[in-house]
Amino acid sequence: MDKSSKRAIAPFDDYAQGVSESRELRKSNEAIGLRVRKGKLTLLSRKMFNVLMHHAQKLGSPGRNAPVVTEANKKYFWVPLADLARDAAYESNDTKRLKEYLQELKDIRIISEDNVQWTSQSLLSAFTLANPNGLKSRGGQIWVGFAFPPEVEAAVMRPDQYTNLAFVYQNQFRSGASLALYEICRRFLTNPSQLTARLPWTEWFDSVSGNPAGQGYPEYKIAKRDTFKPAIAEVNSVTDINIELIEHKLGRRVSERVVRIDLNLTWGNFYFIRLVRRFR
């Protein structure tokens, strides 16, 4: 892909801290490509969940920075609401709406499944807001306290296998499907074949769309036109990788798909080269 085909990335100074280790997430591979059972994973909810995981990892344990010291508050990870909004690129002063987004994130239930176990769980077990000066006060600072379910917290704080993700890229995306696809492909970047897992296209749709799994699918050609192709184009436009779709057909119908991944080091991304190479 030539340099002109890349969408303009924000000036480096705007994201100078974004490419440092303080703005990176070690995301458990178990938390990449999530399939939703209830609710919907939108772009903002995906970004917000990543930001919450990042701050939990940075804090190291619950209870630190609690604005009001109580036994109950020792169970939460605490971070200023302004920091969450900044890191998730939430460009609004509407605190009420941001609280609604956190509630939506808490209400989402996801499916995790392997060869021996199937689990349905929430991404957040609880969240709370606190301001030492009073929630209705115009002064002071609003803090967000949040807690993960036990299985999620273990994956967040002690991931056995993880993928490094920089916020500088997630905050360039305009759709949740693009962010989800980027995370999946970043996970498989070090695969010697540079191919993702080969899966039925419906499983890809579940993971990328953020819609509840198994609750109806469009025709493949519609899913490809409206979801897969725009997401692939955006990943190739703004990130450090180039990807292409490989379709496997059963007769005349597409049954499975896989994505080929190539590392992109164009001049448009020259200041990310060291960051990317360190993870290879």
Q: Which sequence ranges carry the predicted segments?
A:
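Charged, alpha-helix-forming regions
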Residues: 1-280
